[in-house]
């Protein structure tokens, strides 16, 4: 089983997955978890990943281009298009049953952690297969939901 996590905070994600059951599962080779710093896929020297929404709207969203380049890099390494989940408050609610269904269907997943007001809709339309929510509340980013899902999946 492999999970790739696209995030602005890979160190935080790694810290939450370096010990306990997940850490042991990684050490024993039961699960491969790779974090990807989205800023590494920018083309500007400031490594900026946010911008105003295409077509207008309030706040800033994560730009489509660095997200797409990161996603494409993961798919190229895998040699195929990988099922991609955006951790979103608008998605279907994550339950044990949802985790079981995804585990039965996919050996490799990409989890996308959003920030700001969300992710550019063009990236969602082009690359994301489904959106998953951990509940009816707002967090500062998608890292905690991604780690929660990973714990469910690896347990």
Model-predicted segments: where are they?
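Conserved small/polar residues in nucleotide/adenosyl-binding loops
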Residues: 150-155
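Short, glycine/polar-rich helix-capping loops at beta-to-alpha or helix-loop-helix junctions
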Residues: 117-124
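N-terminal nucleotide/polyanion-binding subdomain common to many enzyme families
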Residues: 1-75
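Surface-exposed binding/hinge segments that line
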Residues: 136
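S-adenosyl-L-methionine/SAH cofactor-binding core of RNA-modifying enzymes
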Residues: 63-115
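Short amphipathic alpha-helical face segments that pack within enzyme cores
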Residues: 62, 66, 144-149
């Amino acid at each position: 089983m492999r999970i790739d996590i696209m995030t602005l905070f890979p160190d935080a994600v790694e810290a939450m997955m370096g010990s306990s059951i997940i850490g042991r599962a990684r050490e024993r080779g039961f699960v491969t978890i790779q974090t990807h710093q989205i800023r590494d896929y920018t083309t500007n020297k400031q490594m900026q990943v946010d911008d105003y929404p295409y077509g207008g709207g309030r706040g800033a969203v994560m730009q489509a281009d660095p997200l797409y380049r990161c996603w494409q890099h993961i798919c190229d390494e895998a040699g195929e298009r990988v099922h991609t989940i955006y951790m979103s408050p608008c998605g279907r609610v994550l339950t044990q049953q949802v985790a079981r269904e995804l585990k039965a269907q996919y050996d490799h997943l990409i989890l996308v952690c959003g920030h700001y007001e969300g992710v550019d809709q063009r990236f969602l339309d082009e690359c994301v297969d489904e959106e998953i929510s951990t509940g009816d509340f707002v967090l500062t980013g998608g890292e905690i939901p991604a780690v929660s899902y990973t714990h469910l999946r690896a347990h």
